[in-house]
Amino acid sequence: MSRYDPAATESRWQAAWDAAGVFTARHDPARPKYYVLEMFPYPSGRIHMGHVRNYTMGDVVARQKAAAGFSVLHPMGWDAFGMPAENAAMERGGHPKDWTYGNIADMRAQMKPLGLSIDWSREFATCDPEYYGQQQAMFIDMMEAGLVYRKNAVVNWDPVDMTVLANEQVIDGKGWRSGAPVVRRELTQWFFRISDYAGELLEALDTLKDWPEKVRLMQANWIGQSRGLQFAFSMAGAPEGFDRLEVYTTRPDTLMGASFAAISPDHPLARHLERHDPEVAEFVAECRRVGTSEEALEKAEKKGFDTGLRVRHPFDAAWELPVYIANFILMDYGTGAIFGCPAHDQRDFEFATKYGLPIRPVFLPEGCEETALAEAFVPMKSERVHYIRGFAGAEVQTGEEGVAAAIAFCESQGVGRGVTNYRLRDWGISRQRYWGCPIPVIHCETCGVVPEAKENLPVRLPDDVSFDVPGNPLDRHPTWRDCTCPKCGAKARRETDTMDTFVDSSWYYARFTAPRAATPTDAEEADYWMNVDQYIGGIEHAILHLLYSRFFARAMQKTGHLPAKAIEPFNALFTQGMVTHEIYLTRDAAGRPVYHLPEDVTDGKLADGTPVEIIPSAKMSKSKKNVVDPMNIIRQFGADTARWFVMSDSPPERDVEWTASGAEAASKHLHRVWRLADEISRADGEANAEDGALDKATARAIAEVTQGVEGFAFNKAIAKLYEFTNTLSRSGAGAEAKKRAMRTMAQLMSPMVPHLAEEVWAMLGGEGLVAQAAWPKADPALLIDDTVTLPIQVNGKRRGEITVPKEMAASEVEKLVLADEAVQRALGGAAPKKLIVVPGRIVNVVI
């Protein structure tokens, strides 16, 4: 008997699939469609086991749906713009384009041996001019639809790299790459009006029934709807033009406990004072050395600067509150100004304590008397409290009721109005980087800011750039910026900012429906293929990418690039767990960890016998040397082993730990399946009484594997295949029944281990390719059990069980029960007083 050789067979079947065009997506109105998509990768140059798990999940779904009769779209592309390519050019020389396309070629070569059912004819990279040119066309359409605008905004500026940094790229007040102290600078930036859709994006989350609840909650919190009061304090002794201070608060019920007002360092009043007061300027400069993110402000020490200005309480003109510039107030939320009620906000409490400000409780826990507070009393809004300075009298009510009463009272007195606000800000997309999609805008001295003419698209990035000095190479290119105004024909200047790379990934799913179209989408193809039926990716993309994609689909619908049904582009979302691995380390003389590769450790020791510390189930990390190279696994065991293991060990939403022993066990099982198929293919036994039992086991396997795959319980589907393998190997059924069952096994395991499935299918005489075979259907009659297992109780205690035909007469059941050894021991030779058979449920024996 020959041996199963994955290295020889896997490439052969991949060639057969390619030759037959098995995975080419076909627009077939006569068939239902199914669009499965995994979040496309950044071309870093190497795939990792997380990629293997992610793409195998999508592949299992795609293959099963194709077998079930769907016309399947399962594409692949590359999220290819971004800073890493520029950083590589700075550090190693060369060009970002060469680095990127080289990495794409490497990763494609690593992915293809996995045998994924991808339609590679639809492949594109977001750095392809053909792709970003269509993105530029949509940008122009969005400008014309009023979805794009330009304004001054405060940003994190790295003075060494000379670029804007995202909040996440500011670490301890310094640029993540340069290490230089970051400053806040005001720059003119381009924005998408995502905030116009805040309410719609929030409400529509309730329609996404096939999204994880955690993701929907994360998005809801990010959008951050709040109901509050917007009103104005009148100011005493204010500079000209600043006689009112507009404030937004979500807790107007605490207005009678106010002790100060505070404004953002970027508030117009703070800007005015900064220009006229050196002390204010110094304080504001200090504030701007902290990042602009809420997290950065939360971690920073809370500081304030007393401006000397005062505002009057709206219900008592004699009650004046000091106005501080505070480093924890965000300009882009609400109005950039707040009032502080220290008794009911811990941040305000610490601020008031630091600066000696009064602390006045507005409400107390039920049954408590007013006393000095050691900390802020901040109950849930749903909790009932006793208001002592409320707007609805001294009574007990919830915070929610108190807020509603405060808004109603203030509105009745002409003090402000109730408003709904959102935490979601407009999306700033300007980046002072080369390796991104150029913003297709022209600056003309006569016409102002105008979009590039569409016939001139794409606005291509110039190749002749250098990265030998910091900053954006487009700014210093000798000719690229120079252009002609498309409106008046005069000399003009091209926009040198490029788009945030999240723009690239916010519509790629739509481009896959017609990747070679001369417009961003093709209406007929988009109408057929959209929406994405199953989207798969990491939960780390729960907010930005997924929220931006939801916005972009709406923008594309408004500008005529997507049908109305596609404003929620992803029908179902699955967020998979990570692939983890043990970390192996020793320590140097100073106690610092020294990490070791898995292949250098045997039985917990290095080659020289030094024992290692083992940290279990850690995220794979190059620096900690616990990364498993999928190519090594494929060379050692074959792609099917890697696919089988990452699907089998745990539910797909949870992390799975990669172990060498687990991979070896998976490989052994697949070799066992091959040997079983080889044995059955040569069997010649006659049909017999066991054929029926095997047919029933096959039907159950079909039902349970189908349920597991369709329900994303891949580990349960694989567990059933293990069980079915055992059943088949033990079965004494005739040769034809076993061959029939083995062919079904090939079909059921084809989504997970497609190469081995083709081997088995061919061995057992299957017609054509199993990848093109219809998904098996279980005979409903074979799923009905014709036996039933009845527990036996003697005087109320369980003594055993008996399996009998469902239709067996009660008198016959009684005979079998009385013949049972456990019952006979309990009776001790005596006759029972009663023997009661409850059909289909239980047998009770009374002694």
UniProtKB/Swiss-Prot annotation:
EC number: 6.1.1.4
Highest taxon in the source lineage: Bacteria
Record's subcellular location: Cytoplasm
GO biological process: leucyl-tRNA aminoacylation
UniProt cross-references to InterPro entries, sorted A to Z: aa-tRNA-synth_I_CS (IPR001412), aa-tRNA-synth_Ia (IPR002300), Leu-tRNA-ligase (IPR002302), Leu_tRNA-synth_edit (IPR025709), M/V/L/I-tRNA-synth_anticd-bd (IPR013155), Methionyl/Leucyl_tRNA_Synth (IPR015413), Rossmann-like_a/b/a_fold (IPR014729), tRNAsynth_Ia_anticodon-bd (IPR009080)
GO CC annotation: cytosol
A GO molecular-function annotation: leucine-tRNA ligase activity
Reaction equation(s) it catalyzes: tRNA(Leu) + L-leucine + ATP = L-leucyl-tRNA(Leu) + AMP + diphosphate
Motif 'HIGH' region location, chain numbering: 41-51
Keywords: Aminoacyl-tRNA synthetase, ATP-binding, Cytoplasm, Ligase, Nucleotide-binding, Protein biosynthesis
Motif 'KMSKS' region boundaries: 619-623
Pfam families in UniProt: Anticodon_1, tRNA-synt_1, tRNA-synt_1_2, tRNA-synt_1g
Leader sequence residues: none
Residues bound to ATP: 622
Main location: cytoplasm
Coiled coil regions, renumbered to chain: none
Similarity section: Belongs to the class-I aminoacyl-tRNA synthetase family.
HAMAP family, alphabetized: Leu_tRNA_synth_B
Protein name: Leucine--tRNA ligase
Organism: Cereibacter sphaeroides (strain ATCC 17023 / DSM 158 / JCM 6121 / CCUG 31486 / LMG 2827 / NBRC 12203 / NCIMB 8253 / ATH 2.4.1.) (Rhodobacter sphaeroides)
